[in-house]
Curated annotation (Swiss-Prot):
The gene is atpD. Its EC number is 7.1.2.2. Keywords: ATP synthesis, ATP-binding, Cell inner membrane, Cell membrane, CF(1), Hydrogen ion transport, Ion transport, Membrane, Nucleotide-binding, Translocase, Transport. Signal peptide: none annotated. It holds the Pfam family ATP-synt_VA_C. The lineage of its organism: Bacteria, Pseudomonadati, Pseudomonadota, Gammaproteobacteria, Enterobacterales. This is ATP synthase subunit beta. It catalyses: ATP + H2O + 4 H(+)(in) = ADP + phosphate + 5 H(+)(out).
Length: 460
């Protein structure tokens, strides 16, 4: 192992000088010796003259020039396999849950090539989530990529927790959760939520919180992805949850300028599309197994044209857009049924009945949206009888799109509901056909299946 010396420290970026004949490769892991705590650096650039520029995976406080640095001769390696289930790890794969060693049989490098073209598989199978609005409007493909888009505080993390809970309990699959640059409190809540639902032994948790240095946040998504790839290569169908993909971009922005790159649009790194591609191209399904990924995407200032969410859009099969306007009506999950899309919503994939129901729901809601201005100025009485009926049904549909979540029982005070796709289609079809025109709209708010709405109406 070659040894070098630190010659410069600028925040999270550290320059190390090695002998000319032993310069480490790009992405190699280097370990700083003689520091107070273990610190790993990752080589980003070779500057010439034996000098490499690295990103620190931990805090660079206390580093000084002249400290010895040892080349590990391989990229950062993390534990993979069943030993990681039920554990919380950091970017380096070290346990942070005080439960002792991981006890893994194998470690994999976090930088890997994406599967080759001939290994990829294309599946048309749907993944039922039990969340009405998602299953109806933007169905998920097994082995597909889903983005949860939303501004601050509209429920991305809660939606994600509900998905993990439903999939672990109803489909008994393995999940990997990568917390990228999110709040420590959320990570803690998440851990306890998984423990309470008895699904912790089916989830591997990898955290790099907001307070961690940018190098840590930039690589923690790859750590989680590597663990998911191992499960996939064992022939399993695994779920990968990334919360939040925007912070991954942001970490890249933070180190980009320090690495000496010129910023591009809105101050983002010039390599934005490539960095996103490196991560997204590996999240894919092969002939052995599948990775279905759900990624939360923070939308800065609710602007979907910002370069970061716009770059993410290109990679996704389904987009679930969470809207502040819908959240303000008290309708949760606050999914916007007119803005959310899925490639799977095709009669050849989901069947004609599902397709017609989803499009019918959207057209009624769209018409209601158009009539809102007239109602605001002239009032309901000025509408034609036909339009009054559309408005009444649209308001019922809007309320029926809400649903009590298992993970939000604490907030809502009502027990969570899992609704099968069959019941979802039956319910919305009934409302559209006018079977429930006699029920008050409050009966449809925060219920599971349509039968519950009928029961609730009797009590009102």
């Amino acid at each position: 192992m070659a040894t070098g010396k630190i010659i410069q420290v600028i925040g999270a970026v550290v320059d190390v000088e090695f002998p000319q004949d032993a310069v480490p490769k790009v992405y190699n892991a280097l370990e700083v010796k003689g520091g107070a705590t273990k610190l790993v650096l990752e080589v980003q650039q070779q500057l010439g003259g034996g000098v490499v520029r690295c990103i620190a995976m931990g805090s660079s406080d206390g580093l000084r020039r002249g400290l010895d640095v040892e080349d590990q001769n391989h990229p950062i390696e993390v534990p993979v396999g069943k030993a990681t289930l039920g554990r919380i790890m950091n970017v380096l794969g070290d346990p942070v849950d005080m439960k002792g060693e991981i006890g893994e049989e194998e470690r994999w490098a976090i930088h890997r090539a994406a599967p080759s073209y001939e290994d990829l598989s294309n599946s048309q199978e749907l993944l039922e989530t039990g969340i009405k609005v998602i299953d109806l409007i933007c169905p998920f493909a097994k082995g597909g990529k889903v983005g949860l888009f939303g501004g601050a505080g509209v429920g991305k993390t809660v939606n994600m927790m509900e998905l993990i809970r439903n999939i672990a309990i109803e489909h008994s699959g393995y999940s990997v959760f990568a917390g990228v640059g999110e709040r420590t409190r959320e990570g803690n809540d998440f851990y306890h939520e998984m423990t309470d639902s008895n699904v912790l032994d089916k989830v591997s948790l990898v955290y790099g919180q907001m307070n961690e240095p940018p190098g840590n946040r930039l690589r923690v998504a790859l750590t989680g992805l590597t663990m998911a790839e191992k499960f996939r290569d064992e022939g399993r169908d695994v779920l990968l949850f990334i919360d939040n993909i925007y912070r991954y971009t942001l970490a890249g922005t933070e180190v980009s300028a320090l690495l000496g790159r010129m910023p591009s649009a809105v101050g983002y790194q010039p390599t934005l599309a490539e960095e996103m591609g490196v991560l997204q191209e590996r999240i894919t399904s092969t002939k052995t197994g599948s990775i279905t990924s759900v990624q939360a995407v923070y939308v800065p200032a609710d602007d979907l044209t910002d370069p970061s969410p716009a770059t993410t859009f290109a990679h996704l099969d389904a987009t679930v857009v969470l809207s502040r306007q819908i959240a303000s009506l008290g309708i949760y999950p606050a999914v916007d049924p007119l803005d959310s899309t899925s490639r799977q919503l095709d009669p050849l994939v989901v069947g004609q009945e599902h397709y017609d129901t989803a499009r019918g729901v959207q057209s009624i809601l769209q018409r209601y949206q158009e009539l809102k201005d007239i109602i605001a100025i002239l009032g309901m009485d000025e509408l034609s009888e036909e339009d009054k009926l559309v408005v009444a049904r649209a308001r019922k549909i809007q309320r029926f799109l809400s649903q009590p979540f298992f993970v939000a029982e604490v907030f809502t005070g009502s027990p969570g509901k899992y609704v099968s796709l069959k019941d979802t289609i039956m319910g919305f079809k009934g409302i559209m056909n006018g079977d429930y025109d006699h029920l008050p709209e409050q009966a449809f708010y925060m219920v599971g299946s349509i039968d519950e709405a009928v029961e609730k109406a009797k009590k009102l």
